[in-house]
């Protein structure tokens, strides 16, 4: 077999090569698979071991990710192998991968990445094709991932569980299903198609009343049920996520004595195989397991195994596999043994099976390792309690010693120790139960040479002195026990009865002071007679003195004075100085040089702290950012710890303590934890306050193992807590490494999670390195060390000494019981036993003396009786103690009182217990389960067991109903107000925007009335000319058109009738949308909330309660009827018995009893009353004589059994007389006795009271009997015969009548009983359905509560948007109202201005020669002074600004501009007329000013309305977005609710989903729909057809009307065209052109309007451009001003700084030159000049600032000075 060389380091070359890995990790579940018929595979540490079942040879497949191998799975074709690995933590790690290897070539085919974060724990291929691979991750994510491994793609993933998962398997029978199991759970998965796609849905198995258990193995049965294992040895059969039945062996014994670790289904053979911790493989019948049903009174079923195979007695089996043919099994146990079981071709399997142990390997975590100094042999202590002698080159197990307890401590003994027989390899081991054992390797294996139980708890540490003469053991209970190691067995305690401890001689123990912590390691001091040094989990070193040799341990081993003599030393390490790194491109290299490098085996993590900066990031940038972060962290750490280089104490555990061979009094210490102390190995001198660093440790885990080898200890061997092993060359013996020296060799050999290195060592010849760790693996590596580091040749060549039996001491008795006494307890118990024996001996001597005295007294009594009567003494005189009898009587009375009190106490206790049980089981019930039997037949009906609705439930229901009513009322009120407001708003909006609607119609009608009135007034007065009359007529026509158009609805107008019809159609359309539709949006009124769902659940619970209560009321009424019926039947049966007696008397010789039995025979089975189960509440409190008799019988039986047991087993002969007695004949009849018998008895009694009967002849006298015989001999007459016949017919008639009445009563009751039972069946189905609805509702309520917070946020957002919208709508309505008011007022002002014009026409008629001049004066624009608001008198109260509102004046009202000349009355014109025109002009101008103001106000309101409308659109957009978010949220919520499974009970006739006339296998595509709704939909189809036909007819009629209206419209348009043509012809004939009448009116009334308007527009544009230019200039000047201000400020600051600097310089200069060559006058003058210059500069800048401010003010003013 070629060696598999592991490339461990590229820097050091081939220093170490892996040769083999010993051990099997059989403690890991599902860690053994079959690759072919001869090869099994198992994971251990970082290797996949391939084991040959025929030869036992091993091959290795190394892991690739460096963290170990986690799981393995075999493809169904057995040509592929999947290996899931573990990744080492760190920034450079990409996570673990699953590698697909070809087999047997072992070449990588595929690589699957991204399935988990740290490690894989289980793998499995699916089905027969193996297209899908399932993987389960380890802590912390526990991800279940399904892979399409051929495409290297993830299909699905979900979290498997929150704890360890042991196994995963696909269903071999149902595609898309798989099962996982692990710690405390089993989970059933299926790939389900949801509305969001394919998902993994897992149902956790519910254990219910069964004890929770880890599920190590499971197997799926063909019908989908799953059989799983338990820790207690039972088998669980699962069906649909629930336990169907628990399988046990007969006698309620578990299927295995211990946990079941493996299950296998052998379908061809029809059996299920199970392997457990009892070393047996049991076979179970597949049919019995598959069809198992629980018993009625239990959830379990007892099954007997078909057969069993004993693999190994006492072996804990952990794996069970079968080859492809099923004729051979492969079994592994937790001790590392692998077996093959060959099955016989026929016959019983248990007898014919051949079990062969194929291989034996170390298994379990390694607690310690000892290499031989002579041979390639090692002692390996496994944590599972097995100590093995191993040939680590060949891997053969030479010997082993197993114990049931775990090994917790290990230390080898030096060969010079007296306890090493013949110098053999000897080791001391400590166990979890506190036992310390010594094992020596001998010719027969591993011999036990010493044993002692020193502690109550586990042994935490062991240490042997350098000379091998003393051993110390530290326990977790805080005790430290000292032993002397001897060459011969010692008696030990000297106390009789105590066993010897072999070569362990107990010396003494001490208790550590409280608060010392738990001991983790120890070493003896080098000084002669020195004590022991113990490391603790609190980072302290305890110095424990050696007990004195003359210590008295006769009564106790405890040395009390030693506790106070214990001293403590706290490990304090110096905090490292962290120099700040230079930000350069070689930072990483410098860090590497400072901190040391690690090779590729460590994942590229250098001590310098290099990290990947992410994809696409530059190395320099990442290093710079990291350097800054590290500097901040270092500064914070330095501040917390008192500065860099200061002391830093460790609170982590101390892992190892070793004496420094090159320095007496110094210790080599390694510490745990995550701090700085855990990253190094330290040299500690107990007299110094700080520890000195010795060796660099590991960055990822503390140093857990430290050893030295080579010449003078110049080679250090280090192991870490995560499986790293390092060889480090030392600069000096047992010293530190050279500065900057790299490790000689380093590699991650062991598992990163469980591979804590526990042992390292070089072979005696230096050729091999052996490592051991907690992952159970032992690595053997070949070394090629440099000559200077190679160990010297061995000084003890030869074979290992193996002493024979004669050279070994006697084997001491082993301590195997976990509850055995410790040495101290055994000593104390031995002394107590000795004291008890001495007390018993004293008691025996006293009893013997009493016996002699009693015999002497009896002899005196006999002598007294033999004496003559005269000499005989009375018996009272011979009474030894006269007061003894009185004392005994007083004692009897006292005991009687005590018994009475005890009985009273017991009675009260029973009463309180009964009250507690009644309160717990009955007080919460409104009605318990009561059975009611029918009177005929065996039919029964029961009540509903109804619990009372709690007060909390009722209060919550009432509160929620009240809240629902209040919410409904508030919603109705808000809806009414909102609807009214909405309608008003719409009306206002339409009236204002389109002119339609009531508002616009009213305004148009008002204008029409005004125009009509003006026209009529003008016509009647005759003051208006023809042009004005025509103008008014046209205005009237315009008003008429406006009024007509106002009645026309706009495009947005909706008819109320149409809206009502649409609403009715929406309400009755019958559109049933599936809630499973991805696009389904739940309507507002149907959306579920937690409050609604909780209210529905409470109402359903109340309804179920009311249904059950109503039925129970009917039930109890029927029970009362039964009681009455039985009473009536009892009376009628008594009458029937009397008739039977009369019939017997009538027939003469008939037997009365036979006649009565014949009469009552049809009713013999009737009960005499209600049965106890029909009145449980009444029967519960009643105690009958039969109950007392039965209790007495049981008590007597118990006493008899107790007496029989006390008598020594008299068997059945002693108990025959004490058996239970039968009730007497006159005892109480059973409750279910026949009512007819009682009726017969009562009938006979009644008859006896009324007259003679056949039975009454026994009481006749002799004369009466003679008379009766004589009468009987006389033949009857015809009358008597007739009378007798009449009596017989009468009796038969009454009998038949009574029988019919009784039968009718019974039938009526039975019919009512049957009806009630049928009703109960229906109600029970409804109640169960309601309860299932409650369960579904509970799941929905949980989901709704999860969604409630998000929904509340969305609702709050939507309500805020609605409030904003309502506020804006209200503001728009307010603006609309204001606009309408202003418009009406403006129309009034326009009318007033028209009245002024009309008044002008009246003052200056058309015939006036000065009209044109006066009209020009009237329309002239002049500058007017407007009075300021709130102004008083004076010139300052007037504003001389030009009227800015001229542009708003009509063009027909302006004739000429003010030319600036003086205005005078036209020559020849009347001055009064001229002044009147001027007054009218002032009126016009006043009206125009008011019109301008109103126009400006209307424009402002219009702009405000437009801004509000824009804001309303934005709010509506936001509201639409919130509604969209709400709809998406509701979809998501409905989707989650759709995933809740709802159970619907259907009958077969309700299923109409058939394929080819058959019910399909898969009903997942079915839709459950209400039959009533389906019928309503069908009826709705007919209704819609009828509505469609009606709508077609209406549409046809409307089209006909539309055509008629179009024809009318065409006629009207033709008429209008004809009139327009006539008007055109008339105008052309009369004027030669078409006259614009409106233009003519405007021209006639105001000339030059258009020219003025054009000029005005030009001026406005010019002014606007000029204002824009000035605004730009102002902004530029403002920017310049800001820049200058900043520059000025900077200059001032500079001047201030220069001035201060100058003053400082001058002060210094003055101080230095000390007055030499200094002219104070010149200096003062220079200072004044410089200060003046600065002041001038500041003044100039201030003037510039003032100038700029003036410009700004000038630019901001609106007067005309800026244009000058």
From Swiss-Prot:
Transmembrane segments: none annotated. The gene is CFAP44. It comes from Chlamydomonas reinhardtii. It comes from the Eukaryota. Residues 585-596, 604-628 have a biased composition (Basic and acidic residues). This is Cilia- and flagella-associated protein 44. One of its GO terms (biological process) is cilium-dependent cell motility. Residues 629-641, 1434-1462 have a biased composition (Acidic residues). Pfam families: Beta-prop_EML, WD40. Residues 575-584 have a biased composition (Basic residues). Residues 570-654, 972-1003, 1426-1468 are annotated as: Disordered. Belongs to the CFAP44 family. Flagellar protein involved in sperm flagellum axoneme organization and function. It is found in: Cell projection, Cilium, Flagellum; Cytoplasm, Cytoskeleton, Flagellum axoneme. WD repeats lie at residues 115-157, 160-199, 208-248, 255-294, 361-400, 454-493, 495-534, 649-692, 707-752, 753-791. Keywords: Cell projection, Cilium, Coiled coil, Cytoplasm, Cytoskeleton, Flagellum, Repeat, WD repeat. PANTHER family: CILIA- AND FLAGELLA-ASSOCIATED PROTEIN 43-RELATED (PTHR14885), CILIA- AND FLAGELLA-ASSOCIATED PROTEIN 44 (PTHR14885:SF3). Residues 821-850, 1479-1517, 1567-1674, 1729-1758 form a coiled coil. GO terms for cellular component: axoneme; motile cilium; nuclear speck.
